Swiss-Prot record:
<keyword id="KW-0804">Transcription</keyword>
<dbReference type="GO" id="GO:0010698">
    <property type="term" value="F:acetyltransferase activator activity"/>
</dbReference>
<dbReference type="InterPro" id="IPR036747">
    <property type="entry name" value="ASF1-like_sf"/>
</dbReference>
<dbReference type="GO" id="GO:0032968">
    <property type="term" value="P:positive regulation of transcription elongation by RNA polymerase II"/>
</dbReference>
<dbReference type="Pfam" id="PF04729">
    <property type="entry name" value="ASF1_hist_chap"/>
</dbReference>
<comment type="subunit">
    <text>Interacts with histone H3 and histone H4.</text>
</comment>
<dbReference type="GO" id="GO:0036211">
    <property type="term" value="P:protein modification process"/>
</dbReference>
<keyword id="KW-0805">Transcription regulation</keyword>
<dbReference type="GO" id="GO:0030466">
    <property type="term" value="P:silent mating-type cassette heterochromatin formation"/>
</dbReference>
<dbReference type="GO" id="GO:0070775">
    <property type="term" value="C:H3 histone acetyltransferase complex"/>
</dbReference>
<dbReference type="GO" id="GO:0005634">
    <property type="term" value="C:nucleus"/>
</dbReference>
<protein>
    <recommendedName>
        <fullName>Histone chaperone ASF1</fullName>
    </recommendedName>
</protein>
<keyword id="KW-0156">Chromatin regulator</keyword>
<feature type="region of interest" description="Disordered">
    <location>
        <begin position="162"/>
        <end position="208"/>
    </location>
</feature>
<keyword id="KW-0539">Nucleus</keyword>
<dbReference type="GO" id="GO:0033554">
    <property type="term" value="P:cellular response to stress"/>
</dbReference>
<dbReference type="GO" id="GO:0042393">
    <property type="term" value="F:histone binding"/>
</dbReference>
Amino acid sequence: MSIVNIRNIELLNNPAKFDDPYNFRIKFEAIAPLVEDLDWRLIYVGSASSEEFDQELDNCSVGPIPAGINAFDFSAPAPAHHLLPSVEPDEILGVTVIIITASYREKEFVRVGYYVNTYYEDEELKENPPSVVQWDKLHRNVLIEKPKVTRFQNNWDSAPQLNTFDGQQPAAELPPSGGNPELFNAPLPPPVQRATAAGGMDVDQPMA
């Protein structure tokens, strides 16, 4: 049984320019107080072919965690251009993935992935993208309404565990009432291919 369940994730500035920070507001419920802090990370998937290019944009610790509904704001900078695998327009424009992860006692218990579309707003640039990326004219749109949620078993503070399959929450477990249903029923549009994100875990990635 998960002691912590995400109720809602908002991206306060969406869509935005590519180089703008990501400003999230995360609401979660703890069914019991926690001894340690929760650790959160935001990861930008730079390449579908290698986790080498994943960028951890920022991380934070949140605590102490009382029982009940909790919320916090989490801001992270945009990905660094020089750490991207390529700055060719064909590689920058289009769809990639960002991932929010949450861990307790250094063990990840949930990750939420989102598609991110990178594009030019200017019609002329859309039709004829310049050979050199114009970063100041790039925009992004996170498909915040279409999350992909993966949960992992965690021992928490010696809490009793339900039976699980492959380390994930049992399918019969229902989300807390009043939460965002998209966080518990989170389809991604096909087709997809598999890409490995930070930490060696899989995340869905759209095909080119």
